A protein has these predicted regions:
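N-terminal signal peptide c-region/cleavage motif recognized by signal peptidases
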Residues: 47-49
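N-terminal cap/lid segment of alpha/beta-hydrolase-fold proteins
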Residues: 53-91
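Serine-hydrolase catalytic machinery in alpha/beta-hydrolase-like enzymes
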Residues: 76, 83-86, 95-165
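Primarily recognizes the serine-hydrolase "nucleophile elbow" in alpha/beta-hydrolase
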Residues: 163, 169-225
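The feature captures the conserved acid-bearing segment of alpha/beta-hydrolase catalytic domains
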Residues: 206-261
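C-terminal catalytic histidine-bearing segment of alpha/beta-hydrolase fold enzymes
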Residues: 258-291
Length: 291
């Protein structure tokens, strides 16, 4: 399970919740392990961030490379926190609702693995989809680097949800993969009910992926989400995703919505390469159960 403590980044002045995976034990044992956090994460707690913020120039380059190649859907420009960012909106003929798709670390809203299959495949099932550009850093940036830009994702998520509500009838669902799920969970932890009121269901794909010796610095928000939640991951996913699956399942059960599920796609890895169809079908089948 995750033990949580809030620590301050001296270089940035930002408080961040640290989630430490621990074994089952009594409360006294769990609390004692808090004392080891400064030893485990000295670089995270004391060092200044390597990146000042989202790499907007890289986002612009990626947008220029993909916009002309978009075959399904329409590129749109959304605005948040003083910056424009790319979205790809695709409309279904008979609309059941809207789906906001958040890609993983360092990618873009038409990424061939996970994102593009979902944003097109769910339209075929009657869902309008909006896939947006999440904040990215330079190539090679790791999970701890991306923690510093989690706040940059919050206004983008909110702007995208506003757009979906304006253009879609029915429920609005967030579908987030990998680092996109970290960013969505950060937003929920920070905004609480103000965030939860904005959407109706949540799909997390490959939740909990980080980097070697870089454990999650924030807990999941799943136990706070009294709405339908789908936790889907690959049987050959990253070790952290697999290891923490029971923790996620317990949190989802605690939240109490009977429509929530945890689904393991047996042969799939983190990016669902060659298993895109199973991913789309699993998500679509679960969404159908929301009717």
């Amino acid at each position: 399970m995750l033990t949580v403590v809030t620590c301050l980044f001296p270089a940035t002045g930002k408080a961040v919740r640290l989630g430490l995976p621990i074994e089952n034990g009594n409360t006294k044992t769990r609390m004692a392990r808090f004392h080891f956090l400064p030893l485990l994460f000295p670089a995270l707690l004391a060092a200044p961030p390597l990146y000042a913020g989202a790499d907007l120039a890289r986002e612009k380059r990626m947008a220029e490379q993909i916009v002309d190649a978009i075959l399904d859907g329409s590129p749109i420009r959304l605005h948040a926190a003083g910056n424009d960012f790319l979205g790809i909106y695709t409309e279904a003929e008979d609309t059941k609702g809207g789906v906001l798709i958040l890609h993983g670390r360092g990618f873009h809203p038409d990424w061939a693995s996970v994102v593009q299959p979902l944003r097109v495949g769910l339209v075929e099932q009657g869902w309008n989809t909006l896939s947006i550009q999440m904040p990215v850093l330079q190539k090679g940036a790791k999970y701890f680097d991306y923690v510093h830009v989690f706040p940059d994702a919050m206004p983008r998520i909110e702007a995208a949800l506003d757009y979906l509500h304006e253009h879609s009838d029915g429920p609005v669902v967030i579908v987030a993969h990998s680092c996109g799920s970290h960013m969505a969970q950060h937003w929920i932890l920070e905004k609480g009910e103000g965030a939860l009121r904005r959407f109706d269901a949540f799909v997390g794909i490959g939740m909990g992926a980080t980097d070697y010796r870089q454990p999650m610095v924030e807990p999941y928000a799943l136990d706070r989400m009294s709405m339908p939640v789908l936790d889907i991951y690959g049987g050959n996913d990253y070790p952290a995703v697999l290891r923490m699956a029971p923790e996620r399942a317990a949190m989802i059960e605690h939240a109490g919505d009977p429509r929530s599920r945890q689904v393991r796609v047996p042969q799939a890895a983190h990016y669902f390469v060659d298993h895109e169809r199973e991913l789309v079908e699993s998500v679509a089948a679960w969404l159908k159960g929301l009717d």
